[in-house]
Amino acid sequence: MPPAPDRPRQLPLDLSRRPGFSRDDLVVSPANREAVALIDRWPDWPANFMVIAGPPGSGKSHLASIWAHNAEALIVDHLASGAITAAAQSGSNLLFDGFGDGKIDENALFHAINSTRAASKFLLMTARTWPSQWNLQLPDLLSRIKSAPMVEIAEPDDELLAGVMVKLFSDRQIDVDPLVVRFLVSRIERSLA
């Protein structure tokens, strides 16, 4: 039997898409409008230390990424004491993303807040919960945290869910009828996570 002719091989194309974290990629609705306004106002903030809190998938990290880019901030997303201490000594604007999800080195955080203030820099923290739920024990740190302006991102509303859905379809070059989006929004979970 003669050998089978060589078949043309199909070459896989890497068409993976990285999520966009630019300001242009951000969908704004009443659920996140106050937090977006805060990020857009920088560096004209009411204080140099701010907290944005909201549920998982609400866009905290997206907003923080926009701010970090604009502020040329050092991003600290693993909040071990060594990372916080090193960041505090950097003399940079700081972003602590996802704070309050684990054990907090209160002394390191206290010094980071003081260091950014002394250097006339900014510190933005994002968290799933309000600082009152972080079980902080250090009185001076509690005082600093309580004095920080805080902005909440609410659960995604229909406008935000629809906007994100249209954007995701558009990113994949899929034209979707608004009725389909409305149908999906009325039936999906109220989360972007």
Language model region names:
Residues 131-146:
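Short regulatory helix/loop adjacent to the ATP-binding pocket of P-loop NTPases
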Residues 87-127:
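Conserved nucleotide-sensing/catalytic segment adjacent to the nucleotide-binding pocket
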Residues 47-64:
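Walker A/P-loop nucleotide-binding motif
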Residues 148-160:
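Conserved AAA+ ATPase "SRH/arginine-finger" region at the nucleotide-binding site
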Residues 188-193:
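The conserved phosphate-sensing helix
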Residues 162, 175-187:
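Short conserved motifs of the RecA-like P-loop NTPase core
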Residues 68-79:
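Post-Walker A helix-loop "phosphate-sensing" segment adjacent to the P-loop in P-loop NTPases
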Residues 1-41, 46:
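A short, basic N-terminal segment
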